[in-house]
C-alpha cells in the first residue's frame, strides 16, 4: 500500500509538477514531505500529515521550514 501512494506522488512529481510554476511555500516541498511522511508513519498517519500540510500550502500562510515529525520511540 505504501508503494502505491508513494508511486502516485512520484508520478505527480515527474509528470504534473513540471507543468506548473513552483508554488510550494515550504521546505521540503509538499510532495517530498508526503513521501517522507508515508515512509516514516505508514499510509494512514503519513497520509493524514500530508493532507494537513497541503491544506496549509496557500498564499495566506507564511510557509517556511516544516520537516516531517520524528517517530516517537516506544518504551
From Swiss-Prot:
SMART domains in alphabetical order: Haemolytic (SM01234)
Annotated Gene Ontology cellular component terms: plasma membrane
Membrane protein topology class: Peripheral membrane protein
Keywords of the record: Cell membrane, Membrane
InterPro entries: Membr_insert_effic_factor_YidD
Pfam families: YidD (PF01809)
Cell cycle listed as a keyword: no
Subcellular location: Cell membrane
HAMAP family: UPF0161_YidD (MF_00386)
Family per similarity comment: Belongs to the UPF0161 family.
NCBIfam families in the cross-refs: membrane protein insertion efficiency factor YidD
Function: Could be involved in insertion of integral membrane proteins into the membrane.
Protein name: Putative membrane protein insertion efficiency factor
Originating organism: Halalkalibacterium halodurans (strain ATCC BAA-125 / DSM 18197 / FERM 7344 / JCM 9153 / C-125) (Bacillus halodurans)
Amino acid at each position: 500500500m505504501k508503494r502505491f501512494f508513494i508511486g502516485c506522488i512520484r508520478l505527480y512529481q515527474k509528470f504534473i509538477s513540471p507543468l506548473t510554476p513552483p508554488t510550494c511555500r515550504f521546505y521540503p516541498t509538499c510532495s517530498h514531505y508526503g513521501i517522507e511522511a508515508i515512509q516514516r508513519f505508514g499510509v494512514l498517519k503519513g497520509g493524514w500529515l500530508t493532507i494537513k500540510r497541503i491544506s496549509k500550502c496557500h498564499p495566506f500562510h507564511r510557509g517556511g521550514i516544516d520537516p516531517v515529525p520524528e517517530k516517537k520511540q516506544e518504551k
